[in-house]
Amino acid sequence: LVSVEHQAARLKVAKAQQLAAQLPAMCRLEGGDALSASQ
């Protein structure tokens, strides 16, 4: 049986990895919008 602490830690890591994966795409989108707006 997986302990609650272990489950919570795994969930936190998964969330952090998900955020880390989304950040570059978000930055690229915002950067692209800013570039197209300035032109």
Swiss-Prot record:
The keyword Disulfide bond belongs to this UniProt entry's keyword annotation: yes
InterPro entries according to UniProt: Glutenin
Keyword Disulfide bond listed: yes
GO molecular function ontology, one term from the record: nutrient reservoir activity
Keywords, in A-Z order: Disulfide bond, Repeat, Seed storage protein, Storage protein
One protein family per Pfam: Glutenin_hmw
Assigned protein family: Belongs to the gliadin/glutenin family.
Subunit structure: Disulfide-bridge linked aggregates.
Further comment: Glutenins are coded by several genes on each of the group 1 chromosomes of wheat.
Annotated function: Glutenins are high-molecular weight seed storage proteins of wheat endosperm. Thought to be responsible for the visco-elastic property of wheat dough.
Protein name as it appears in the record: Glutenin, high molecular weight subunit PC237
